[in-house]
Amino acid sequence: MCIRDRQWRGRWDTIQTISAWLVPVLLGVAFGNLVAGMKIIVADPKTPFVEVGPENVDIANAGMSQIHSFIGLGEFPFSQLLSLLIGGSGFAILGGLVIASLSLVQGANFLALKTDGAVQERAVAIAPKLGLISTILTAVFAVWGTFAFKGDGFLFALIFLVLAAVCLIVSLLFAFKGASAKAFTFNSIAIAMAVAWVFAMLFPNVMKSSIDPAYSLTIAQSSASAGTQIVMTVAAIILVPIVLGYTIWSVYMFRARISVAPAGGLEPDKIREGANFLVG
């Protein structure tokens, strides 16, 4: 099997396309479920199918209990992860569409920055259209989530919501002007603010229960021990600069634009014309 085999290429193109769509959609669904809350209960590990009453749940005994997803999976392996992804609602599904649309806009702006010729023209043309759809979907999702599922972090969530909205609008305006670099920058900031909004909505929890607030998993309950936090902090101090360093270096090394023009040393039989975005 090689790149010359059409069936082999087609099979992997299909797999790559499906995977590329599934990742942002499922990530958005997970975020939506986290914000809205999941159908989880706290059960005593000695009798895992017997619910602990909300009045009996506190930090002291929660450490001896288990959080169960309540979607009929029981003790099925990875049931909590599955409930996060498939125990969805209309809000969670909208979250999947939002993340997918934001990813499309980000990709279009990035293509406009990294390509030349016809490819760049197509990316510049499609970016504002995708940006308009993305902005509308994000606005509905964020306003719905902020006011329907507000908690203790409402004020911070509102601040991040406003910042994300401003950045999305500015990004959209730059996209319509063809200023791809500025559009990409502000869309990136908007995505960062959106992530901050999600965790502000969760505060002071890391996982909310839609059945009863007493069943929610709080930051205090899920935090690591002091020793573990020290190890993690030291590791972060050492590794984060390294990661940032090689990321900046790789971006700098690959700063040139990609063109469909023939490149010296590239074997002609490795180019597949007429079957990808580069040639339409």
Residue ranges and their predicted role:
Residues 16-33, 187-194, 239-247, 251:
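...captures the hydrophobic TM-helix bundle architecture rather than a specific catalytic motif
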Residues 6-182, 197:
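Long, contiguous internal "core" modules enriched in hydrophobic/ aromatic residues
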Residues 45-47, 70-71, 207-217:
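Peri-membrane helix termini and adjoining interfacial loops of integral membrane proteins
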Residues 209-231:
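Short, membrane-exposed interhelical loops at transmembrane-helix boundaries
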Residues 106, 202, 250:
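Divalent metal-coordination and catalytic microenvironments
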Residues 190, 256-276:
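Short, highly charged, low-complexity non-transmembrane loops/tails of multi-pass membrane proteins
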Residues 1-5:
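Conserved small/polar residues in nucleotide/adenosyl-binding loops
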Residues 174-181, 245-261:
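Membrane-interface capping segments at transmembrane-helix boundaries
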